[in-house]
A protein has these predicted regions:
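Hydrophobic packing residues in well-ordered alpha-helices of helical domains and bundles
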Residues: 104, 211, 231-234, 238, ...
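Basic, alpha-helical interaction scaffolds
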Residues: 277-344
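Catalytic palm active-site di-aspartate
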Residues: 38-41, 57, 91, 95, ...
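A terminal-accessory region detector
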Residues: 349-370
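Conserved pre-catalytic core of RNA-dependent polymerases
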Residues: 1-185, 222
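Active-site palm subdomain of RNA-directed nucleic acid polymerases
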Residues: 73-91, 192-222
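Short, conserved micro-motifs composed of acidic
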Residues: 236, 250-283
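A glycine-rich phosphate-binding loop feature that marks nucleotide/adenosyl-phosphate handling sites
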Residues: 40, 253-265, 331, 351, ...
Length: 370
């Protein structure tokens, strides 16, 4: 908030020298300016009952000059962690060259190996409660020192995190400032990287298991030939994960965490596996519906409903906008949904029906009979 980024870009030649001096002074003094540490939170309605506050998503706006200074710090900190290969390979979130598709491919490759070897695999999808908002500043700074970050850098990051405030703005009314004592600042440039650093040692605690991370989306997989042994190993892994989360001040929502058993064996003896809480045959993971046999039927059904709905929207637009606008709408309403994760599910039988919906949408854009 404050000045727009467009305005800053237009006057960059005028302000570049004083702005550079200010940024260098902040770095030399190991201090993040107090005037840049107040966020404006705007509640954005999602869906459901309009008077239910849980149906609103808080969007935090920060001063534009805060983001410029953060970007300078973020570039240097990222370079240090990437050059020294400190960030674990299990983490796919907020990293250059990594995406949700990479995380999904890594997970599916592992399940495919389980199927080929005739083993069992229990995948536990952990639901963390407000992980970004519960990060302990003291613990994070301690971890920066452990990773040999220079004390001066630790001080300015500590200054960035502490003595922060936020105010809520809604329909022209603004609340008083409230202190923020935990968490990485929402809407910040530096926040996502600091969360990755905070969470970086989590997979190390579970070295016997395969851990896939996309920021705070966490999946722990346990593989074994014996259906009794796998339960013991899975429970041991979840216990370790819970201990790590507790010691780091984070909370696990056990009621929303999901367990899935992957196996191609026809009649496995699963008597003990009934002890697993919330065991399901399908679940939603990084925008893809995964089933325990990797047949993708459920994903195909959900995607077909979405594409059919969007095709109807496209047809409603056809007589009201130009073909160029229709092409843009086709890209956002059809193609982006169809392409997402297609490397994973594209071989499944559901693709034929999904592509037929796409053909109908193409005919609408081309002005051909539906």
């Amino acid at each position: 908030y404050g000045f727009s980024m467009e305005l800053i870009k237009n006057v960059k030649d005028v302000i570049i020298t004083p702005l550079t001096k200010l940024i260098n002074l902040c770095i030399q003094n190991k201090t993040f300016p107090k005037c840049l540490k107040t966020g404006i939170v705007i509640p954005v309605f999602k869906k459901g009952e309009i008077n239910d506050k849980s149906n609103y998503r808080p969007i935090s706006l920060l001063p534009v000059f805060s983001k410029i200074l953060e970007k300078v710090l973020c570039i240097q900190l990222t370079k240090f962690f990437e050059d020294n290969k400190i960030l674990v390979k299990n983490q796919f979130g907020f990293r250059k060259g990594c995406s949700t598709s990479d995380a999904l491919l890594s997970f599916i490759d592992q399940i495919s190996e389980v199927f080929e070897s005739g083993n069992y695999c229990i995948a536990t999808y952990l639901d963390l409660t407000k992980a970004f908002d519960l990060v302990s500043h003291e613990t994070l700074i301690r971890k920066l020192y452990v990773y040999n970050i220079h004390p001066d850098s630790c001080r300015i990051i500590s200054s960035f995190l502490t003595e922060r405030f936020q105010r809520v703005s809604l329909k022209g009314t603004t609340s008083s400032d409230l202190p923020v004592s935990r968490g990485v600042p929402q809407g910040s440039v530096l926040g996502p990287l600091l969360f990755l650093i905070f969470f970086n040692d989590f997979p190390i605690e579970l070295n016997e298991n395969n851990v896939i991370l996309f920021a705070d989306d966490t999946t722990i997989s346990t593989t074994d030939k014996n259906c009794y042994e796998i339960l013991t190993r899975n429970q041991r892994a979840i216990s370790k994960a819970s201990d790590w989360l507790c010691s780091n001040g984070l909370a696990l929502n056990e009621g929303k965490s999901v367990n899935m058993l992957f196996s191609l064996k026809k009649s496995p003896n699963l008597a003990n596996l009934t002890l697993l809480p919330n065991i399901q045959t399908t679940t939603r993971f990084l925008g893809i519906t995964i089933d325990d046999k990797l047949l993708w039927k459920e994903h195909g059904v959900i995607l077909a409903k979405q594409l059919s709905k969007n095709t109807f929207m496209l047809r409603s637009l056809a007589n009201q906008v130009s073909q160029e606008v229709l092409k843009i709408a086709f890209s956002s309403l059809i193609q982006c949904f169809l392409r997402y994760g297609i490397l994973i599910w594209g071989h499944a039988s559901c693709r034929h029906y999904l592509f037929s919906i796409q053909r109908r949408a193409i005919r609408i854009v081309a002005g051909l009979p539906y």
